[in-house]
């Protein structure tokens, strides 16, 4: 019996877990490890940024949908990978063993690479729903007072 862990619960990790579940044996286990309990549908972030959608329209709890297919969900997030031990160190200090690991964590944003870019600069991002909400607030402010 193998334990497959999918690190990341976004647009890569969630479909990967569903597809792997269909291919593995009934004895094999799959666990998805995400940062928090909520799945965000990233392709709709631009709609949040222009206030055509609200955050709650594009997010839902991940665990119930995965569990319905027999996939475990852990919202604690990964702090470190220990490949020599086939083990993850979770953000709360506990560990999780795996036989196979899929890394589907998405991008690491590097706003500091370009001067003036990002939330502390002169631009707005829609890469994460938190960014899209802030961009929507800025857009609303601009619409009310375009200068």
Predicted regions and their residues:
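Rossmann-like dinucleotide/flavin-binding elements
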Residues: 1-30, 109-113, 119-120, 125-147
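Beta1-alpha1 glycine-rich phosphate/pyrophosphate-binding loop at the start
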Residues: 2-72, 117
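A conserved short coil-to-beta-strand element within the FAD-binding core of flavoproteins
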Residues: 74-86
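Core beta-strand elements of the Rossmann-like FAD/NAD(P) dinucleotide-binding domain
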Residues: 91-100
